[in-house]
Amino acid sequence: MVRGKTQMKRIENATSRQVTFSKRRNGLLKKAFELSVLCDAEVSLIIFSPKGKLYEFASSNMQDTIDRYLRHTKDRVSTKPVSEENMQHLKYEAANMMKKIEQLEASKRKLLGEGIGTCSIEELQQIEQQLEKSVKCIRARKTQVFKEQIEQLKQKEKALAAENEKLSEKWGSHESEVWSNKNQESTGRGDEESSPSSEVETQLFIGLPCSSRK
């Protein structure tokens, strides 16, 4: 019985698709192994199932094979000569860039009031609108900068006021301490002056008192 040829298109039935994937995957892994053994070739195979499951085979080390592949492709790209088509494309891009630069330079000169002698009414109106728009942007930015500076000055004022208050409190407590010390010294001197410090003179009389003498 002749086996029918399989049509190369996506299998719609999910179960049949999974069965076919398992069979073909095993066959592919087997072929990769046989190729590496029979031909002494470095073979690496990476397969992701429809559900994202990884299947891999490497005759040596998978990462080493990947690194070798990246080095090979990098060298191949770096040594690839620039084709005529790429050269023409680069020339076109360079010419287009120069044209844009010239247009920007001309627009800049017109905004500065230079080279407007040949401008039409429409072009002059367009330049005027651009200038008005620029002035509005500048004024808005200027207002914003003023607000930021005012806010910074307010914050600085608050910081200076707080520092001044701390210094005032510190100076007030120091002044009170000085006055307290002065009062204590004054009180001490007053007590010394008011206390009896004079010496008492005594005389020794021998005999009868004067009133009893005859």
Swiss-Prot record:
Induction: Up-regulated by gibberellins, vernalization and under long-day conditions. Gradual increase during vegetative growth. Induced by AGL24 at the shoot apex at the floral transitional stage. Repressed by SVP during the early stages of flower development. Inhibited by AP1 in emerging floral meristems. Repressed by SHL to prevent flowering. It is found in: Nucleus; Cytoplasm. Residues 87-177 form the K-box domain. The keyword Transport does not apply. It comes from the Eukaryota. Residues 162-177 have a biased composition (Basic and acidic residues). Disruption phenotype: Plants are late-flowering. SMART domains: MADS (SM00432). One of its GO terms (cellular component) is nucleus. Its main location: nucleus. GO terms for molecular function: DNA-binding transcription factor activity; DNA-binding transcription factor activity, RNA polymerase II-specific; protein dimerization activity; RNA polymerase II transcription regulatory region sequence-specific DNA binding. SUPFAM superfamilies: SRF-like (SSF55455). Widely expressed. Not found in the apical meristem of short-day grown plants in vegetative stage. Residues 178-187 have a biased composition (Polar residues). Keywords: Activator, Cytoplasm, Developmental protein, Differentiation, DNA-binding, Flowering, Nucleus, Transcription, Transcription regulation. Changing residue 34 to K: In sso11; partial suppression of early flowering time mediated by SOC1 overexpression. The keyword Protein biosynthesis does not apply. Forms a heterodimer with AGL24 through MADS-box domain. Interacts with AGL15, AGL16 and AGL19. Interacts with OXS3 in the nucleus. This is MADS-box protein SOC1. The gene is SOC1.
